[in-house]
């Protein structure tokens, strides 16, 4: 945001120097990024009268001018074409240093001596562009400093505003802050507005079809204007803040934008079909050509201003080429409105179309400024372009904003800031920036009820008001103190501690954590081959998605992790151990808010070990992933788990997957990803995946085990081999073994599985090793054999096992 010293003084009669003002603004939170002293060091640029203008004898595009600047008459060679004898111009005499460190020297141009330079506005730093040299009023006496004669000596401040301060995107907003700093009154100059006899409502109408996106829309009709160049004062004002002059009507709207901070738009009334305005959403794929002559494809989320036939402006962003004010325009319809910040930001971002108007609307304009800005603009247009303002303003206001009140306790202000401010001090600070304050004295507590004005959308809570008090009282006035109170160490919540524990287990197992967006494309579930009635196909939709590919909340971590595999494999990184531990979001029929559930998803693919001369090229398989799951279960002390040799998940291979259960509760699924799913993700190698319900895991977890000393007595092992039916999983065998063992059994390990020669069809041979140990004695062979026989009998009785 750019403001100038002189423009601020039109609103506040302050006495601060330019440097002091810059310091005070910065300390008030409006950081001054740069200062530019307009006209500084240019006192030697003086008014001069052209005595004669002759063609250069050796150059068709140059002229030789005799210039009278009061003290003397000098010869200057000039390349401009817009001057003649008798004109008063700006002469930079020899020795002058112009902006850009350009020093004027005596020179010889095509054989003709030149003692200075006739300057344009651009060369003097007064404009971004210019068509010729600067022609001044013929009444100016030669020899006077140009910047003094025109009153152009000024200081330009460029402010680095934070997004939460839209109120300071105007000269008025910054002046309000200056008024609060120096305790001077704020003077808002609103010129009188004269109206004609014709009624505005008889000639036009305004219809708002979407009050959510456009809570307020006002319009005035001005007839008989003459579009042309703006007067010098208006051009200078705009150029001082970096704006280019277009024509008198458009310049007035830009002037109001910069001074009051409210965007306006002028339509050519005669080019509006049926002479009326309709505010509504655009049609999908609707084509619209904006003022920059670019045809843009609109969406249903875009708000447009229409006439009786179609769109004439992209609301809050840019006008349309089909209704712009041109030299032939006679009647104009002037728009002043308030648009939903989110809607404007979404449209501006999607179309990559930024403007001064969208910059203000998307941060939050002042809805109360709508009629004020409109009336002042109408009065100025009549002043600079003529015409008559039709009687009455159309002001459609279907959705007034609710009044916002915040209660602030004096004690809370002082506790946070370490000050001893009284109620009157705090009240004075808040009143100085335009807030309404009502003191409320209660028993032992002084409070202020503060009504927040519409130009401060950033003030929502009492802590925001505390910040305002600190800012206005002066950060320099906050005393330096040592921290008060006790230093307390707060443990993180239990849930976060458990999350960290699981992360540590995965990292210790050699996995790398990934973090993906919680937003995915609606088509993500198709690639997982989910059934049509799967509840994960009903995701929570985002109201304002950044893109269509991130328009719904994810109901599973699987698509995101498989996309990580796809990207890594594409970069020749195919040996992967990845996991993600994050929430998913499921819809709930009885509640507006979705259900948030934490899940763990992990993938394995490629080589088991990193490449090296001592390592082999063995690939990971299902049992590598199963081992990781066993580490998780052991870390969380989850007991009595079964491995169901089937999975209902369509994204897993039906013959190479299983479901992890504790009794009837499903803890998760794991297995090889289905080939169809791998093909959908462009993955050409086997991938093993774990999808674990973290919350069910915590519910199944046992307490932390107590300390158990190692036995100092020897261990004895017994091996047994037996035949069982092929379809009996080891989890069922393990359950029988666990039930039949006594206190002497320390461990049971399956160390061999055999199918083939000598084994009947439909059978498999399993070999187990049982280790026995006592804590208080050396075991005798009779004790060990008795315990081992009990295990063998249980296998025969429960599973029909045949001992080999």
Curated annotation (Swiss-Prot):
GO terms for molecular function: ATP binding; magnesium ion binding; phenylalanine-tRNA ligase activity; tRNA binding. Its EC number is 6.1.1.20. SUPFAM superfamilies: Anticodon-binding domain of PheRS (SSF54991), Class II aaRS and biotin synthetases (SSF55681), Nucleic acid-binding proteins (SSF50249), PheT/TilS domain (SSF56037), Putative DNA-binding domain (SSF46955). It is found in: Cytoplasm. It catalyses: tRNA(Phe) + L-phenylalanine + ATP = L-phenylalanyl-tRNA(Phe) + AMP + diphosphate + H(+). Residues 39-147 form the tRNA-binding domain. Binds 2 magnesium ions per tetramer. It comes from the Bacteria. Mg(2+) binds at residues 458, 464, 467-468. PANTHER family: PHENYLALANINE--TRNA LIGASE BETA SUBUNIT (PTHR10947:SF0), PHENYLALANYL-TRNA SYNTHETASE BETA CHAIN AND LEUCINE-RICH REPEAT-CONTAINING PROTEIN 47 (PTHR10947). Belongs to the phenylalanyl-tRNA synthetase beta subunit family. Type 1 subfamily. GO terms for biological process: phenylalanyl-tRNA aminoacylation. InterPro entries: aa-tRNA-synth_II/BPL/LPL, B3/B4_tRNA-bd, DNA-bd_dom_put_sf, Fdx_antiC-bd, Fdx_antiC-bd_sf, NA-bd_OB-fold, Phe-tRNA-ligase_IIc_bsu, Phe-tRNA-ligase_IIc_bsu_bact. This is Phenylalanine--tRNA ligase beta subunit. Keywords: Aminoacyl-tRNA synthetase, ATP-binding, Cytoplasm, Ligase, Magnesium, Metal-binding, Nucleotide-binding, Protein biosynthesis, RNA-binding, tRNA-binding. Its cofactor is Mg(2+). Pfam families: B3_4, B5, FDX-ACB, tRNA_bind, tRNA_synthFbeta. It comes from Syntrophotalea carbinolica (strain DSM 2380 / NBRC 103641 / GraBd1) (Pelobacter carbinolicus). One of its GO terms (cellular component) is phenylalanine-tRNA ligase complex. The gene is pheT. Tetramer of two alpha and two beta subunits.
